[in-house]
């Protein structure tokens, strides 16, 4: 053991988190409608499988892109050779325009300021290497994605200081919470280098308000620190509201091309909006030339393959397709989210009101034996081992209040979701709290129209996939 590095022998990866342990339990006994109908249903995977049919249809109509051809001629040899790690200009242009389209074309993205990375995991870590020394800190609002403990800290040596948010205001970021987190970092003798937020939020399923974004920009301006806005769920908005990017706020405040804009960085990915986590496509957008230059050099450790760039540049350049896709994706996400919420309500369970994402932030505080995180983990174990549903406990997301859980809804068929909700309802009704819930109060709920989405992807083994899905 003495011959190994501390990264190997330490527990900095966070693999013992209940977030990852739930995945491991699922892999031991995965649900299958025919082969294993009593198996565990995966509701801890933030994967978007609702619109695969649209992409498959596009591939059928565009065989050249899928077959690595140009004007009917194979370009296999061209794509098989070493690529420029700056990325293909055509693909970066298509990515920039797709990001603009998601934001209603209110803001623009310069392709030259985009750095490609093998997913948002790589993009976020690269930014940490660019912005922080080992021991420096970033402030993150809670609850936050459990993988950040690995992505931001494990190899970089950076620290995370939580910005404590509460259910009293829907877990929104407040000025007092920001100041308290900053002061806590100072007490710990940590140099604060910036704030990182996910917008829309994982795990809350809510987009940051304009007020919160204004507050964040004002805060990092006053402290002379950085702001990273992880916007990988920006195309999953399904409410009436438009997605507001931090880039919108910079434009509204007339801070474009200022020193402040050089300290605001956006992370994006095609894993959630297009449902392509296996393609490993992420990006950093920064107005700081030094960041772009350094991150581009670092990207050689996690490139996006030239074959992937060629295929997706063709897909994203088809404006008719992207417009129709984003609209239909929004409709299907909204329908699926409503189905989950309705099913939970029939079991006497409510959620934080959400307008984005592939999951709901579910309130099960009334099912806890005591108001403690120990009771939360006890409830989680019952749901995992007895009900056979893998969901993510709030404690794995550093939530300050026990009893909240992240439940995903876009990685399964409607029939599987209905079965999961049936199992959960049966469990709740078997508890003392469940027996007190009046069933008559739920008779007013209207059933949602079913939508069938075919060709659900068979879950590959835990050992065969990179465990960084959000």
From Swiss-Prot:
UniProt catalytic activity: S-adenosyl-L-methionine = 1-aminocyclopropane-1-carboxylate + S-methyl-5'-thioadenosine + H(+)
CDD domains for the chain: AAT_like
Top-rank taxon, per record: Eukaryota
Keywords of the record: Ethylene biosynthesis, Fruit ripening, Lyase, Phosphoprotein, Pyridoxal phosphate, S-adenosyl-L-methionine, Ubl conjugation
Gene Ontology molecular function: any one: pyridoxal phosphate binding
Pathway info: Alkene biosynthesis; ethylene biosynthesis via S-adenosyl-L-methionine; ethylene from S-adenosyl-L-methionine: step 1/2
EC number(s) reported in the record: 4.4.1.14
Activity across pH: Optimum pH is 7.8.
Tissue: Expressed in roots and siliques.
Keyword S-adenosyl-L-methionine: yes
Modification after translation, per record: May be processed at its C-terminus.
Phosphoserine modified-residue sites: 461
Gene3D superfamilies linked: Aspartate Aminotransferase, domain 1, Type I PLP-dependent aspartate aminotransferase-like (Major domain)
Cofactor: pyridoxal 5'-phosphate
One Pfam family recorded for the sequence: Aminotran_1_2
Induction remarks: By indole-3-acetic acid (IAA) and cycloheximide (CHX). In response to low dose of cytokinin.
Enzyme class at the top of the EC tree: lyase
Record annotation: effect of changing residue 269 to N: In cin5-2; defective in cytokinin induced ethylene
Modified-residue entries (N6-(pyridoxal phosphate)lysine), positions: 272
Residues the record lists as binding substrate: 47, 85
Mutagenesis / variant outcome for changing residue 201 to F: In cin5-3; defective in cytokinin induced ethylene
GO BP terms in the entry: cell division; ethylene biosynthetic process; fruit ripening; phloem or xylem histogenesis; response to cytokinin
Subunit structure: Homodimer and heterodimer. In vivo, the relevance of heterodimerization with other ACS enzymes is however unsure. Interacts (via its C-terminal region) with FEI1, FEI2, ETO1, EOL1 and EOL2. Interacts with GRF3.
Entry function: 1-aminocyclopropane-1-carboxylate synthase (ACS) enzymes catalyze the conversion of S-adenosyl-L-methionine (SAM) into 1-aminocyclopropane-1-carboxylate (ACC), a direct precursor of ethylene.
Family listed: Belongs to the class-I pyridoxal-phosphate-dependent aminotransferase family.
Protein's name in the database: 1-aminocyclopropane-1-carboxylate synthase 5
The encoding gene: ACS5
């Amino acid at each position: 053991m003495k011959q190994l590095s501390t990264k190997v022998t330490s527990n900095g990866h966070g693999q013992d988190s209940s977030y990852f342990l739930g995945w491991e339990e699922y892999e031991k006994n995965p649900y299958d409608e025919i082969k294993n109908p009593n198996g565990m249903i995966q509701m801890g995977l933030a994967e978007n499988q609702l619109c695969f049919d649209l992409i498959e249809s596009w591939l059928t109509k565009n065989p050249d892109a899928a077959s690595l051809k140009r004007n009917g001629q194979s370009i296999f040899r061209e794509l098989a050779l070493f690529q420029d790690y700056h990325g293909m200009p055509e693909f970066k242009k298509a990515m920039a325009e797709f990001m603009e389209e998601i934001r209603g074309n209110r803001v623009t993205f310069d392709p030259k300021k985009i750095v490609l990375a093998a997913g948002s995991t790589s993009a976020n870590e690269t930014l940490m290497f660019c912005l922080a020394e080992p021991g420096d800190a970033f402030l993150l609002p809670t609850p936050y994605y459990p993988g950040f403990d690995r992505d931001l800290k494990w190899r970089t040596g950076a620290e995370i200081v939580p910005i404590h948010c509460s259910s009293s205001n829907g877990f929104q970021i407040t000025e007092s919470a920001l100041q308290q987190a900053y002061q806590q970092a100072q007490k710990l003798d940590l140099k604060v280098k910036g704030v990182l937020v996910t917008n829309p939020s994982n795990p809350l399923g809510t987009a940051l308000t304009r007020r919160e974004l204004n507050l964040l920009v004002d805060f990092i301006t006053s402290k002379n620190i950085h702001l990273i806005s992880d916007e990988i769920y920006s195309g999953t908005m399904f409410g009436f509201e438009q997605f507001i990017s931090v880039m919108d706020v910079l434009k509204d405040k007339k801070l474009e091309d200022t020193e402040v804009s050089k300290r605001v960085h956006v992370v994006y990915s095609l894993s959630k909006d297009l449902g392509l986590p296996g393609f490993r496509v992420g990006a950093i957008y920064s107005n700081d030339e030094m960041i772009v230059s350094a991150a581009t050099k670092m990207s050689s450790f996690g490139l996006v393959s030239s074959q992937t760039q060629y295929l997706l540049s063709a897909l994203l350049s088809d404006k008719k397709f992207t417009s129709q896709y984003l609209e239909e994706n929004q409709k299907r996400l909204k329908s699926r989210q409503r189905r989950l919420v309705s099913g939970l309500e029939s079991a006497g369970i409510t959620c934080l009101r959400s307008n984005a994402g592939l999951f709901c932030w579910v309130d099960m505080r009334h099912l806890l034996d005591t108001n403690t995180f120990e009771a939360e983990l006890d409830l989680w174990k019952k749901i995992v081992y007895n009900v056979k549903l893998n969901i993510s406990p709030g404690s794995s997301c550093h939530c300050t209040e026990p009893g909240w859980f992240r439940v995903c809804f876009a990685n399964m068929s409607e029939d599987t979701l209905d079965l999961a909700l049936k199992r959960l309802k049966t469990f709740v009704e078997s508890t003392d709290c469940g027996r007190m819930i009046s069933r008559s109060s739920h008779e007013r709920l209207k059933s949602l129209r079913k939508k069938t989405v075919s060709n659900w992807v068979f879950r590959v083994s835990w050992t065969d996939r990179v465990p960084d899905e959000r």
